Amino acid sequence: MSGLDINGLSMRFDLPNGSSVQALKDVSISLKPGELMSVLGPSGCGKTTLLNIVAGFLAPTEGKIELNGHLVTGPDAERGMVFQKGALFEWMSVRENVDFGPRMKGMPKAERDKIADHLLEVVGLQDF
């Protein structure tokens, strides 16, 4: 099926003291192309964990996610994530963060470099 299919998704985090936290348990969701969904709930209920798994940033403990019939195994150009607060990938330089989106879309490096140079100069961050 095309769209987003989440089947039997569970996520458990093991803690250093030997205990664990069950962040998600047996979540199943199906969205057809064009359908929208909001994820709402109190702090600590697993919203961010779910979205990080859908984006491919975390691997679930159990279950699977398929997007347009393809198994989600990591981040790629088919999915994105808008963070609650402004965020950069901490392990990347400012330039690498600016380059990330166009690179995921498959834009040629020369074109990405030109755009990154321009944008960084506009905001005065060309030296970062």
Residue ranges and their predicted role:
Residues 63-75:
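Conserved ABC transporter NBD signature motif
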Residues 99, 103, 110-128:
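Conserved ABC ATPase "signature" region
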Residues 55:
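Helix-to-loop junction immediately C-terminal to a conserved catalytic motif
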Residues 40-42:
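The feature captures the beta-strand-to-loop junction immediately N-terminal to the Walker
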